[in-house]
Amino acid sequence: MSLMLDDQPPMEAQYAEEGPGPGIFRAEPGDQQHPISQAVCWRSMRRGCAVLGALGLLAGAGVGSWLLVLYLCPAASQPISGTLQDEEITLSCSEASAEEALLPALPKTVSFRINSEDFLLEAQVRDQPRWLLVCHEGWSPALGLQICWSLGHLRLTHHKGVNLTDIKLNSSQEFAQLSPRLGGFLEEAWQPRNNCTSGQVVSLRCSECGARPLASRIVGGQSVAPGRWPWQASVALGFRHTCGGSVLAPRWVVTAAHCMHSFRLARLSSWRVHAGLVSHSAVRPHQGALVERIIPHPLYSAQNHDYDVALLRLQTALNFSDTVGAVCLPAKEQHFPKGSRCWVSGWGHTHPSHTYSSDMLQDTVVPLFSTQLCNSSCVYSGALTPRMLCAGYLDGRADACQGDSGGPLVCPDGDTWRLVGVVSWGRGCAEPNHPGVYAKVAEFLDWIHDTAQDSLL
């Protein structure tokens, strides 16, 4: 199975056709428009034969030289193609930048995690290997929400102080105490302690995301079984699947801004979102959640698909189940290295020549590209912005296509799945040297949090 990419690329990345198209002819200045005499024609033929003979000798010498080059340097004549692991073959390409830009040094931050057994919040300070229980002193719901966001969750669902006398502690357990004068994520704000003055530690729960309850029952195949990607959504205009989307919360779905921009004149009441769907043939009239608001990123550019994300707020909340659930966002400062095996899914065209979407949900694995390689002259020649990332293969074996736009690119983080990209654009579908381009979700976390914060359920 091959998924293939939706929209045409930015103008800078499109093919440029050279010369007149088929069947187009023109007369150049100086062309003769009247008949030529036979004598002139014969003399012209003799001169032409002599010229052709000389050109033939030169051409023969050129072919011989080229064959010698092929024999001595066979690799030089091969087209640039291959998988991500063949990155060294692009060394002759002109890179968009000689080296990756160095980021300014950021203040060291504290790391958090939530114990899955008792939901106690733990912190790691100053690169110490030990995880410390967080004292309840100085705690606030606002800090709890910030921590949930930093872990890739969209909302805070529960928090409280737990008495130390109610939990089992080993004798070596240490604690982290927050200084009320400093920010909650700066390392200097947290001090290791042997005990908590209040006698309480923090219990924290965030919205559930990134889990696949039915994953253990799925075996092989490229047509997707129910529950394999529970956050996959179908964004439909009327009864027609238009784009993919990803469920972030019961009333929030993220998709591509260009999907909404292409149909910006459509009535809001015509949009519906289907979740837990595998086959479109199973959809019945009036099914799906109506869209209450469409919120494209305010900086979206229709010219180069920069900032290509949009949020959809639903009129009614989705009912989460084994087949419907939310995907996690990337954690704070989380980095997925090039070569990471991620998955893209959707109902898009399964072949470049097809003009219809797939009835069954499809998926395929794609490795992440380095932005430097994707912006090289061999691939997209600098068309990518910092809000974009690449995933796929240089040999074009698998990709996304029309109808997949807005859908999820997810990467595993242990047992948790995180939304790393939103299907955005590419050159053609599964073309060699042109992998898929995705909106980089990590660049939009603040906007997603700020937009969804006031009206989450």
From Swiss-Prot:
This is Transmembrane protease serine 5. Residues 218-453 form the Peptidase S1 domain. One of its GO terms (biological process) is proteolysis. It is found in: Cell membrane. Glycans are attached at N163, N170, N195, N319, N375. Residues 112-207 form the SRCR domain. Residues 1-21 are annotated as: Disordered. It comes from Homo sapiens. Disulfide bonds join C135-C196, C148-C206, C209-C328, C243-C259, C342-C411, C374-C390, C401-C429. It is linked to Defects in TMPRSS5 may be a cause of deafness. The gene is TMPRSS5. The record marks R217, I218 as: Cleavage.
